[in-house]
Amino acid sequence: MDNTSSVPWASAASVTCLSLDAKCHSSSAKSTASSISATPESQTMRHIAHTQRCLSRLTSLVALLLIVLPMNFSPAHSCGPGRGLGRHRARNLYPLVLKQTIPNLSEYTNSASGPLEGVIRRDSPKFKDLVPNYNRDILFRDEEGTGADRLMSKRCREKLNLLAYSVMNEWPGIRLLVTESWDEDYHHGQESLHYEGRAVTIATSDRDQSKYGMLARLAVEAGFDWVSYVSRRHIYCSVKSDSSISSHVHGCFTPESTALLESGVRKPLGELSIGDRVLSMTANGQAVYSEVILFMDRNLEQMQNFVQLHTDGGAVLTVTPAHLISVWQPESQKLTFVFADRIEEKNQVLVRDSETGELRPQRVIKVGSVRSKGVVAPLTREGTIVVNSVAASCYAVINSQSLAHWGLAPMRLLSTLEAWLPAKEQLHSSPKVVSSAEQQNGIHWYANALYKVKDYVLPQSWRHD
């Protein structure tokens, strides 16, 4: 992850970019020669179109490099267990003992799999949210013969598939066995996440009980939200509901939260546009204005659970649990970034001083939660933003501000190159341009792609799962 590791690929990328640029200009020259009689306006439009095609190719190349290269880092660099990608674990994993659960909390707490949301029947509206799992590396017992054991929530399927891969790496020739998933026959008492497709009961295909402690550990590493070595005969795992995990997918603020524009005007995040310059923070904790280059998530209708941080100076920040917040460490005199739901009272966050305009530490005096409508996640060129006077990262899920900022480099490059292009409206007959903020509704495609690959390239200790 250090700077020296990026030199080889940067050189290769530069050569490739030069090649692409040469091809694009060569194509442009041929086109110009074949149409000498064309008007200056048509030549300008053709040049813009060629430049945009070069830009698209270049951006795709850089994005591919930044996604693929972390997969080639050694386990020592990534500090990870090495599951997936066929590597052996770089650190020892200890099996769970009988009756042990991880985390050591009630299954229905928010820090584990969360509360029950209601039984799902075949005639329930939520039944369509269950998805079948046809992974050939998993055996499904399916005693009922209805295929019910293949049905589960999307999050449960994602974690189960990761676990199946880990089982094959740990014990070649052995497959993961699912003995129970979604239950429509009420075999598990009155309260069970099996009825919602959020729980699975698992074993190994050889039924070797000596493997079950390690199987439970692999389930924890795969990202299940609650794992219990409840019986010598099987392992029980469950996950948060799909409706609640969006707070773990991307970090967002409420649309009513405000950012300070360079003009001195406070603007609600729900009204921000691409190109707005808002108050942000440098890596050294200095206040600076930075351009909004895209929205990683924007949905003004989505209901969401938020964490609320109250400071002794009266600032209140409302943010999703997985969002990174700047925290000042007075003992070491260092600035760190911590997930919002892991900030405690007496921690110090950076807040803008209304008199000097500088960012100063203020003590957190209360940490609460609230459910509200709408999510907005602007990305600035600096990778940080000051919201409701509190300094925060633009990133979430990954417990590393620098790594997350590095991962969004292609989008910053794209924004820079687009700024060099002639005005896009020259390519259209209508001069009206609709802002990206008005068009976007949902998660940005690039942010979503990074989220999907994180489980394969980052250790669980780096993720907010």
Swiss-Prot record:
Residues annotated as site: Involved in auto-cleavage: T320
GO annotation terms (biological process): Bolwig's organ morphogenesis; cell-cell signaling; cytoneme assembly; epithelial cell migration, open tracheal system; genital disc anterior/posterior pattern formation; germ cell migration; glial cell migration; gonadal mesoderm development
Keyword Signal annotated: yes
Catalytic activity, EC: 3.1.-.-
Binding site for Ca(2+) 2: E144, E180, D183, D185
Binding site for Ca(2+) 1: E143, E144, D149, T179, E180
Lipid-attached positions, N-palmitoyl cysteine: C79
Subcellular location: Nucleus; Cytoplasm
Residues the record marks as site: Essential for auto-cleavage: H323
Residues lipid-modified (Cholesterol glycine ester): G251
The keyword Nucleotide-binding is assigned to this record: no
GO cellular component, one term: plasma membrane
Key words of the record: Autocatalytic cleavage, Calcium, Cell membrane, Cytoplasm, Developmental protein, Hydrolase, Lipoprotein, Membrane, Metal-binding, Morphogen, Nucleus, Palmitate, Protease, Segmentation polarity protein, Signal, Transferase
Site, as annotated: Involved in cholesterol transfer: D297
GO-annotated molecular function: calcium ion binding; cholesterol-protein transferase activity; morphogen activity; patched binding; peptidase activity
Family (UniProt): Belongs to the hedgehog family.
Quaternary assembly: Interacts with shf.
Protein name: Protein hedgehog
Organism: Drosophila yakuba (Fruit fly)
